[in-house]
């Protein structure tokens, strides 16, 4: 098996009414935990790494791990560059084998965002690499980037249509009321806006900030056309919470084979639930 482009995964999801879960990874243990569940449930999966992830663990190491697990579990998977902002950075990682990238120019004015995304699309498509971009802007914290509520804004459907036409992007992350991180109260998702975007945009749509969003809300976005669901914060909280609890019960403990497994098992429960919410189980052959 191999590392593949998200384009093929998302096209199938769009055609068959489900979503592919995209889980953020941080180290070898998080990769292993996610893929253990995806293999067991035979779910397609996207492993997403932010620039901060690749500062912590080298791309070459992550790529080697993903390739090995793809063979071990006999399943294709996509390794995705999440929230990258530099063409040069993306170019280097694509040359190293990555076949899926998100270029995030959502903090720029529309025309500047288009220009940046188009430059990435032109390069990536020459390398059989799919490209995701974001229009509108989510609030919250992602990696080292923080966006306050005043700077966040929702995606305009007609601008989304024009953006996709001008850039040739393969998938579009839309801002419809979610945010990166956890919520102090139940998020207000603009389902009508999502439906209007789906009517005028034909590429797969992406939901960022899906951690802590009620399952029924996520399912509704999938019914309305979302085909990729990003999950990051919930994974980290589950892992860290379990490890903290283990140390509270085992204050003299020091063997990572024990406490890391506890964290991985807690993370696996989140992964299992998100696969069920996305409706992606049993969609790759054994």
From Swiss-Prot:
SUPFAM superfamilies tied to this protein: Aldolase
Family matches, as InterPro entries: Aldolase_TIM, Class_II_FBP_aldolase, FBA_II, TagBP_ald_KbaY, TagBP_ald_KbaY/GatY
GO cellular component: cytosol
Pfam entry (one): F_bP_aldolase
Pathway note: Carbohydrate metabolism; D-tagatose 6-phosphate degradation; D-glyceraldehyde 3-phosphate and glycerone phosphate from D-tagatose 6-phosphate: step 2/2
Family stated for the protein in its record: Belongs to the class II fructose-bisphosphate aldolase family. TagBP aldolase KbaY subfamily.
Quaternary data: Homotetramer. Forms a complex with KbaZ.
Function: Catalytic subunit of the tagatose-1,6-bisphosphate aldolase KbaYZ, which catalyzes the reversible aldol condensation of dihydroxyacetone phosphate (DHAP or glycerone-phosphate) with glyceraldehyde 3-phosphate (G3P) to produce tagatose 1,6-bisphosphate (TBP). Requires KbaZ subunit for full activity and stability.
Protein name: D-tagatose-1,6-bisphosphate aldolase subunit KbaY
UniProt organism field: Escherichia coli O7:K1 (strain IAI39 / ExPEC)
Gene from which this protein is expressed: kbaY
């Amino acid at each position: 098996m191999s590392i593949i482009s998200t384009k093929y995964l998302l096209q199938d999801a769009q055609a068959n009414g489900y979503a592919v879960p995209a889980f953020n990874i941080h180290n070898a243990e998080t990769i292993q935990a996610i893929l253990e569940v995806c293999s067991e449930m035979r779910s397609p999966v996207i492993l997403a790494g932010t620039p901060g992830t690749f500062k912590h663990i080298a791309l070459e190491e992550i790529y080697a791990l993903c390739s090995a697990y793809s063979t071990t579990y006999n399943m294709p998977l996509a390794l995705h560059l999440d929230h990258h902002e530099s063409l040069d950075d993306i170019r280097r990682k694509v040359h190293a084998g990555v076949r899926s990238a998100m270029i995030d120019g959502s903090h720029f004015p529309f025309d500047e965002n288009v220009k940046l995304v188009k430059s990435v699309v032109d390069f990536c498509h020459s390398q059989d690499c799919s490209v995701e971009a974001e229009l509108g802007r989510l609030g919250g914290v992602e990696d080292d980037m923080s966006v306050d509520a005043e700077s966040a804004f929702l995606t305009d459907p007609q601008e989304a249509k024009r953006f996709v036409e001008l850039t040739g992007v393969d998938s579009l992350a839309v801002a419809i009321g979610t945010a990166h991180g956890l919520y102090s109260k139940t998020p207000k998702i603009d389902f009508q806006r999502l439906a209007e975007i789906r009517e005028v945009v034909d590429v797969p749509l992406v939901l960022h900030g899906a951690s802590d969003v009620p399952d029924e809300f996520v399912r509704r976005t999938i019914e309305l056309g979302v085909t990729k669901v990003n999950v990051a914060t919930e994974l980290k909280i589950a892992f860290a919470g379990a490890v903290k609890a283990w140390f509270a019960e085992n204050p003299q403990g020091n063997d990572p084979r024990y406490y890391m497994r506890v964290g991985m098992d807690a993370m696996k429960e989140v992964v299992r639930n998100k696969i069920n919410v996305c409706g992606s189980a049993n969609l790759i052959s054994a």
